Curated annotation (Swiss-Prot):
This is Transaldolase. The active site is at 132 (schiff-base intermediate with substrate). Its EC number is 2.2.1.2. It is found in: Cytoplasm. GO terms for cellular component: cytosol. Transaldolase is important for the balance of metabolites in the pentose-phosphate pathway. One of its GO terms (biological process) is pentose-phosphate shunt. Pathway: Carbohydrate degradation; pentose phosphate pathway; D-glyceraldehyde 3-phosphate and beta-D-fructose 6-phosphate from D-ribose 5-phosphate and D-xylulose 5-phosphate (non-oxidative stage): step 2/3. It catalyses: D-sedoheptulose 7-phosphate + D-glyceraldehyde 3-phosphate = D-erythrose 4-phosphate + beta-D-fructose 6-phosphate. Gene3D superfamilies: Aldolase class I. The keyword rRNA-binding does not apply. Keywords: Cytoplasm, Pentose shunt, Schiff base, Transferase. Belongs to the transaldolase family. Type 1 subfamily.
């Protein structure tokens, strides 16, 4: 009998949520995703020192200004790690725009262009890159413009139906609705434990998936942020699932049967009017969990970006 991971792969495209190249070699995913926290973690792996040295050396050729060098080195390091991962996966790498730009559409677009240029200079076509942006109104608007240029985007830190609807209406390539962080909030808020089938994060992704398929949206749904394998198995059939190394390895060592839970409907209905900015902001405001988790996620990614830059600054000085 195939192990749990192999069974899941028959229903869903598996993506590795890590910057650890050795972990990717073991799990053999289709794609991989990174974020500022994962880049910071990867930068502390001794085997990656050459990638850091390369980023530092490159940054020094771009500017004499230390702050500019730090920013350039951070961008180049994220791309360098992405380049190594692309040697191991047949599909795409998701590389994230600085979380501190989450409320600046123009700066987010400029950063996306820079990341794409760095990949292209290394011989990687933009068709293998997903630009990750936080699912703020500004991030979604930035993604809409980037998609119009042929730059595909992955909208992350997505916790609400309003975010999912706005992303679909903007025509973004892929969304990453979070599962585990939603569960964290509800467990803390209610003091309850939840069975996997009733997990609020699982329910959220299921609702988004069904809405997208019912209205014929092409945006890919990639569940993210898992706390246990039960959540993952409950989302078998989702377009994609991005999973951390420890849970991938746990499923590879398990023979738990996997049954498809999500199936696209063949009965589609045209969507209604496009959501306005005012509607988006009101619906977000009414969802305390989504407001809190989005803000917390942006803050935490910004903190880790700052830590990475401090590490690079010490090497540049």
């Amino acid at each position: 009998m195939a192990n749990t991971l192999e069974q899941l792969k028959s229903f869903t495209t598996i993506v590795a949520d890590t910057g650890d190249i050795e972990a990717i070699k073991r799990s053999q995913p289709e794609d991989a995703t990174t974020n500022p926290s994962l880049i910071l973690k990867a930068a502390q792996i001794p085997e990656y020192s050459g990638l850091i040295d390369n980023a530092i050396a490159w940054a020094k050729t771009q500017s004499d200004n230390l702050e500019t060098q730090i920013e350039d080195a951070a961008d180049k390091l994220a791309v360098n790690i992405g380049l190594e991962i692309l040697k191991l996966v047949p599909g795409r790498i998701s590389t994230e725009v600085d979380a501190r730009l989450s409320f600046d559409k123009t700066a987010s677009i400029a950063k996306a262009h820079k990341l794409i240029r760095l990949y292209q200079e290394a011989g990687i076509d933009k068709s293998r890159i997903l630009i990750k942006l936080a699912s703020t109104w500004e991030g979604i608007c930035a993604a809409k413009e980037l998609e119009a240029e042929g730059i595909n985007c992955n909208l992350t830190l997505l916790f609400s139906f309003a975010q999912a609807r706005a992303c679909a209406e903007a025509g973004v390539f892929l969304i990453s609705p979070f599962v585990g962080r939603i569960l964290d909030w509800y467990k803390k808020s209610t003091g309850k434990d939840y069975r996997a089938s009733e997990d609020p994060g699982v329910v959220s992704v299921t609702d988004i998936y069904n809405y997208y398929k019912r209205h014929g949206y092409k945006t890919v749904v990639m569940g993210a942020s898992f706390r246990n394998t039960g959540e993952i198995i409950e989302l078998a059939g989702c377009d994609r699932l991005t999973i951390g190394p420890s849970l991938l390895e746990e499923m590879a060592a398990s023979n738990t049967p996997v049954v498809r839970k999500l199936t696209p409907t063949t009965d589609t209905v045209a969507p209604g009017p496009v959501m306005s900015e005012a509607e988006f902001r009101w619906e977000m405001n009414q969802d305390a969990m989504a407001v809190e988790k989005l803000a917390e996620g942006i803050r935490n990614f910004a903190i880790d970006q700052g830590k990475l830059e401090e590490m690079l600054k010490a090497k540049l000085a």
